[in-house]
Amino acid sequence: MKIFCIGKNYVLHNEEMDGRKYKTAEPVVFMKPESALLKNGKPFFLPEHLGRVDHEVEVVVRICRLGKNISERFAHRYYDAVTVGIDFTARDLQRRLKDNGHPWEIAKAFDGSAALGEWRTIPCQEPSSDLPKEEGVEALASGESAVKTQEEPSLKKDWDGLRNGLSFHLDINGKTVQTGNTADMLYKVDELISYISRFFTLKTGDMLYTGTPVGVGPVHVDDHLEGYLEGEKLLDFWVR
């Protein structure tokens, strides 16, 4: 299972971090290990040695089939669920690493740095005979199957809402600190899936954190974090 993450995908967030509004020439992609996952409402234990750790609320999608070199027009067939998550970032450490021209994975990919909410399913369409094999569109091969389960509720909004606009926000201690809408993404989900699949084979169960909007800030011990998608609370945990 791979956790893909996108940076610099909301123009106002780019401005708050770099002092100017801009769009990168290509999506900024980085990854987190499976050990970064924090789910089921478990607390986030703040690593003291990392210094300031910021919250970055994001919409997360789940990959539902095998694919490689996927064209954007078929990308919607490759995800079957959506939720909200938090990309925790050791901000002081990240800045030091970037200033020195070093990779900054340790500031983004430490244990517990990928908080994940409850999934809400959306249609994962079956591939049809008109899809070219070179697009990487295959029947779920090698025993792979979609990860959707009967227990998972469906997203109340039609899946097209992910393209046209899903609202999400993060509350800390009852106060809203970040709000966003997928309509404001610089690179949309289908574009991101197509781009990432040029470099990595996507597999069932992989996840894509799609970037954070403006409003990032530090978390502290005893903070209560709640993440919402389309007004529904899908993420709820404490910082310890």
Residue ranges and their predicted role:
Residues M1-G85, R91-R96:
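Extended, compositionally biased flexible segments
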Residues N9, H13-T24, R91-D130, E151, ...:
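Catalytic-pocket segment enriched in acidic/His residues
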Residues A139-A141, A146-T149:
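Ala/Thr-enriched low-complexity intrinsically disordered regions
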